[in-house]
């Protein structure tokens, strides 16, 4: 697809790739509800457009790369928080996951939109489902996937209406997800 990200291998290229992402993040943080363009990234970063197109063939590919970067950060936090959990109760795992996700979203409000793209939803939903299946092998993968999509969409709903995840929305997201899991 036209949003394919070409990941660099060489050190110099990796630095350029990172610079594009840093600039894109800077633009998103300074302009709320802004649509990112390669032209703006080129202007602000001082990089030439052809060198940006080398890694990012489209505007969407920059957003996808930012999504991936923040999804991986969130997933690492989730895994760290689940490391010390020694019980296999799937509901307890989801409580932790939902809390960590809400905290991450609230601490990164300016760029949280990138966690709610279709690309991010697919990545998070797959990775979280796999993590839950690893911790609780008795749960059905499809059930984990649906539970994950449920809490992500309810957190997004809260984020959209309040520009953060309030304790009330967090509580309701957990209740909905846990209610589904208990059936």
Residue ranges: model-predicted function:
Residues 1-15:
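N-terminal intrinsically disordered/low-complexity leader segments
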Residues 13-24, 41, 66-70, 74:
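Generic hydrophobic, amphipathic alpha-helix propensity
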Residues 19, 27-61, 65:
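Helix-turn-helix
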Residues 28, 61-73, 77, 115:
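Alpha-helical DNA-contacting segments of helix-turn-helix folds
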Residues 65, 79-106:
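Hydrophobic alpha-helical connector segments
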Residues 95-123, 157:
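Amphipathic alpha-helical segments used for helix-helix packing
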Residues 96, 116-148, 168-178:
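Amphipathic alpha-helical packing segments from all-alpha helical-bundle domains
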Residues 107, 148-167, 178-183:
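Amphipathic C-terminal alpha-helical segment
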